[in-house]
């Protein structure tokens, strides 16, 4: 495994440990060059409450690897979180920089009513 990936996973592990101590619902993000995924995971980590990604039927037709697609995923996860009764979450960026697509998703989720 490359040093860059190891460093990202180390950052992710530290952040998840801190979130686990809080025991709150977390918004976990995963990013690949082509797609972006978001999951709401319960405080104990046992269940996925809601999920959204660029692989969803409504989002799959357009471009999937850009900031506009990330905004759409952020709005969709916020909508599904509200439907599940979740308003407050901890943002788990999985060790990725808070920039670009990650930031676009987070901003759209905040606009949709999620509180970080």
Curated annotation (Swiss-Prot):
| Lineage: superkingdom | Bacteria
Record InterPro entries: Ribosomal_uL18_bac-type, Ribosomal_uL18_bac/euk
Q: Which UniProt keywords apply?
A: Ribonucleoprotein, Ribosomal protein, RNA-binding, rRNA-binding
Q: Which Pfam families match?
A: Ribosomal_L18p
GO biological process terms, alphabetically, are:
translation
Give the UniProt entry's GO cellular component terms.
Answer: cytosolic large ribosomal subunit
What molecular functions are annotated in GO for this chain?
5S rRNA binding; structural constituent of ribosome
Any idea what job this protein has? This is one of the proteins that bind and probably mediate the attachment of the 5S RNA into the large ribosomal subunit, where it forms part of the central protuberance.
HAMAP family, per database record: Ribosomal_uL18_B
Give the quaternary structure. Answer: Part of the 50S ribosomal subunit; part of the 5S rRNA/L5/L18/L25 subcomplex. Contacts the 5S and 23S rRNAs.
Family, as annotated: Belongs to the universal ribosomal protein uL18 family.
Q: Name it.
A: Large ribosomal subunit protein uL18
């Amino acid at each position: 495994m490359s040093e860059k990936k190891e460093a990202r996973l180390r950052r992710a592990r530290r952040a998840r440990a801190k979130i686990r101590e809080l025991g709150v619902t977390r918004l976990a993000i995963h990013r690949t060059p082509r797609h972006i995924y978001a999951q709401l995971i319960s405080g104990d980590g046992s269940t996925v409450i809601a999920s959204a990604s660029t692989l969803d039927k409504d989002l799959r037709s357009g471009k999937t690897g850009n900031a506009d697609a990330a905004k759409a995923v952020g709005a969709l996860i916020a909508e599904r979180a509200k439907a599940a009764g979740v308003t407050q979450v901890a943002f788990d960026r999985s060790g990725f920089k808070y920039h670009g697509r990650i930031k676009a998703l987070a901003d759209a989720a905040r606009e949709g009513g999620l509180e970080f």
